[in-house]
C-alpha cells in the first residue's frame, strides 16, 4: 500500500510540475530558438532520475524506469491540460472570433493550407468571422484599413515577431527584430538605393533585359510560360547586383542548382508552421542539408565578390563599404551572408511575381494596352526599344496600372507578422493585448470594400484620376510601410516600369486558347512571397 501511495503521490507531483512549468515558464516569454535544447534537457532529467531512483531506492533500473516513465507521462498530461485550458478559456485573445481549432494550436492554420494558399484561406476566414480573426493561439489577422499604419507605420510600437529568427544566428536587414539594430543596418543599405546607385543598376540590368527579350522574340507565336522567363531574368539580375555575377539562367533556360535548392527549401514556408517547428528544420542537420548547401554557395560567391573590383557599383559594394578593405569578423561575415541572400531572395521572387501579374492583367485588359501605348508615344526609346527610367517614372497610367496590379496581386500577399507592445494596441476601438502576433494580409485588404470602391474591378485610373475610388490609401502597402518597409522598392519599381514599357512597345499579349489565367493566379503559392509557377501566354509582334 505504501508503494502504491508513493507512486500515486509521484504521479500527482508530476502533474503539478507540468502545470507549474507551463504557468511559470512556457506561457511567458519566447522559447522558439533552441527547440532541441528542451529535448536534451528532458532526456537528461529522465535518464538521471531513473539512475538516481534505482541507486537510492535499491530497485532495478527497469522498475525505476517504469516509475520515472509514469511521472513523465503525468508531467506532460499536466502541462498540456494547463496549456489547453489556458488557450481555450483564459488566453488574452479568448474573446476574439475565429475557428475553435485555432485557439488550441498554430498547426490548425497550417493544416488548412494543404489544399489552398494562405491568402485564400485568410480571405475565407475573414468572410466568415469578420475583420479580426484569431488564426492561432496568440495570432490575429486584421483587415481594418487603419490597422496597416498602426501595425507597420512609422509611429507603430509593434516589433517583429519570432518568425524573423528562423535563420539565427545568421542575420540580415530583414531579420533584425530590434528597431535600433535595424535602423543602423538600414543606413548601410540606404547608400545602395540612392539616385546615383539606381542609375548604375539601370545600366547593369539592361544587359539582362536584352537577353530576356531575345529569348521572348525567339518564342513569338508560341505558348510560353512567362513566369519561368521572369524568374530566370530576376535571379540573373539580382545575382549580378548581389555578387557581381549572374546565375546564367537566361542562358541555360533553367534554374541554377543553388536557386533550385532555395526554391525547394521555401516550400515549408507555405504552411506557416509555428516558429519552433521551423527552427527544428534549421537546426537539425539531416533536415537542413540543402539550406546549408545554399549558405555555403552564398559564402563562396560573397568571398569572390569581396576580391573583385567592379567598375559600376552593385548593392554589395554598399554592404562592403564599412569594412574599408579589411577582412570581416565572423559576426560581420554572417551578416554579409544574410544580407547577400536577402538581395537575391527578396529582390528576385517578388519582382518576377510582380511582372507575371502585370502580364496577366495586360492579357486580360487589351484596352489598357492601347492607353499605355498612347502614353508612351511622347517618350523616345533607343534602338533596342529600351526606355530610360527617368523619362517614364512619372507616367500616370503606367504607374496606375502597376499600382492596381500590386493591389490585387501583392508579391507578399498575406502574413508579415508583428508583435504588439506590452500595453497592447487599439484598432477600430478594439484593444489587442500585448505580446500577441498580428498581421494585415494585403491580398485580403486589397479586395476589401472598406479600403477601395469596386475592389474587384481593375481600374488604373483610380490612382490618378478618380481618387474617390480609394477610401483609405494608407491600406495599400505592397512594399510595406514604416521603418521596416522594403528598402529595394525604388529598384523594384525601376525594373518593373522599364520591363513593362518595353513589353508593351514590343508585343501583343494574349492567353492561349482555353486559358484565361484566373485559376493559375488564384492558386498561386504563398510562401511568404507569392510564387506563380505557370502563366502561359502567347506573344506576337505588336500590330
From Swiss-Prot:
GO terms for biological process: alkaloid metabolic process. It is found in: Membrane. Heme binds at residue 486. It is an enzyme of class 1 (oxidoreductase). It holds the Pfam family p450. Its EC number is 1.-.-.-. Its cofactor is heme. It is a multi-pass membrane protein. Notoamides have been shown to exhibit antitumoral activities. Notoamides A-C show moderate cytotoxicity against HeLa and L1210 cells with IC(50) values in the range of 22-52 mg/ml, but the IC(50) value of notoamide D is greater than 100 mg/ml. Moreover, notoamide C induces G2/M-cell cycle arrest at a concentration of 6.3 mg/ml. Residues 1-21 form the signal peptide. The chain crosses the membrane at residues 41-61, 65-85. Its main location: membrane. One of its GO terms (cellular component) is membrane. Keywords: Alkaloid metabolism, Glycoprotein, Heme, Iron, Membrane, Metal-binding, Monooxygenase, Oxidoreductase, Signal, Transmembrane, Transmembrane helix. GO terms for molecular function: heme binding; iron ion binding; monooxygenase activity; oxidoreductase activity, acting on paired donors, with incorporation or reduction of molecular oxygen. Belongs to the cytochrome P450 family. Cytochrome P450 monooxygenase; part of the gene cluster that mediates the biosynthesis of notoamide, a fungal indole alkaloid that belongs to a family of natural products containing a characteristic bicyclo[2.2.2]diazaoctane core. The first step of notoamide biosynthesis involves coupling of L-proline and L-tryptophan by the bimodular NRPS notE, to produce cyclo-L-tryptophan-L-proline called brevianamide F. This is Cytochrome P450 monooxygenase notG. It comes from Aspergillus sp. (strain MF297-2). The gene is notG.
